[in-house]
Amino acid sequence: MHFTKAHGLGNDFILVDCFKEKVNPEDFPGLAVKMCDRHFGVGADGLVLLLPSPSADVSMRIFNPDGSEAEMCGNAIRCVAKYLYERGMVKADRIRVETLAGVMIPELLVEEGRVRLVRVDMGEPRLERSEIPMEGPPGRVLGEPLETGGAVYRITAVSMGNPHCVIFVQDLDAVPFQTAGPLIETHPAFPRRTNVEFIQVLTPEEIKMRVWERGAGETMACGTGACAAVVAGVLNGYTGRRVTVHLKAGDLFIEWPEGKHVYMSGPAEEVFSGEYPYRT
């Protein structure tokens, strides 16, 4: 089975083109566990399957290293857009990608036939507790206390098609990240678990972020997480609506025009291609 390794700011993925490769859908979760293993597999933060779609140019399904399926991934969708365009599978600089969170529309900045930057319409944020989903009374979750592991965190909950728990801190380096991340991810308040973002506000136009991804652990970047962080920053009065998000391996630029969709801009890179032993 042929695959391509790609990343968006170090958030890395294995892409399998199911237009060409025959893969049994029942095998998707197990393949993700095996292929994403960094010691015994290819190594990645997720396995991305490209499939035909009746309503878009392509359908994208993404599975975490633990075999669970994610609704959406902003860094992965940029990698998918680059893959499709540079192989001539799409001709336009706007692509429709079907995900479990809906149809997303990446726009490509192309120079000399190469995709240099991808801007993605990530849709509208969902803010009601039931839409996250999160246990508790109706309404938004803004700066609400959440107790776990003997500590209390002030959280803001945002869904970008997948759940995010955003926490603003004074000093990102002082956060007990490896302890707090998994405790919050699996907290009973989140019936489908959650992604966790710790945010340090530098200025209203700049923030630093560390992310603990549901089903993957700490990753170097998270596109939907960066979007959720800026939405939370606006709602709490910490940031403006055009924000640069500093991540471990680089920056994403997030825009949230008032009352409208969230837009994410960032790079995507291919690393290598290879063959993985698989039989249907």
Curated annotation (Swiss-Prot):
The main location class comes to cytoplasm
Please give the Gene Ontology molecular function terms for this protein: diaminopimelate epimerase activity
> What Gene3D superfamilies does the record point to?
Diaminopimelate Epimerase, Chain A, domain 1
Q: Which reaction(s) does the protein catalyse, per the Swiss-Prot or TrEMBL entry?
A: (2S,6S)-2,6-diaminopimelate = meso-2,6-diaminopimelate
Which cellular component appears as one GO term in the record?
cytosol
> In this UniProt entry, which residues are annotated as the site Could be important to modulate the pK values of the two catalytic cysteine residues?
164, 213
Q: Name the active site residues.
A: 73, 222
- Where would you find this protein in the cell? Cytoplasm
- Record keywords: Amino-acid biosynthesis, Cytoplasm, Isomerase, Lysine biosynthesis
**Domain of life of the organism encoding this protein:** Bacteria
Q: In which pathway does it act?
A: Amino-acid biosynthesis; L-lysine biosynthesis via DAP pathway; DL-2,6-diaminopimelate from LL-2,6-diaminopimelate: step 1/1
Q: Name one GO biological process term.
A: lysine biosynthetic process via diaminopimelate
Instruction: List the Pfam families hit by this protein, alphabetically.
Output: DAP_epimerase
Family per record: Belongs to the diaminopimelate epimerase family.
Function recorded in the entry? Catalyzes the stereoinversion of LL-2,6-diaminopimelate (L,L-DAP) to meso-diaminopimelate (meso-DAP), a precursor of L-lysine and an essential component of the bacterial peptidoglycan.
Q: How does it assemble?
A: Homodimer.
Q: What is this protein called?
A: Diaminopimelate epimerase
Give the source species.
Answer: Pelotomaculum thermopropionicum (strain DSM 13744 / JCM 10971 / SI)
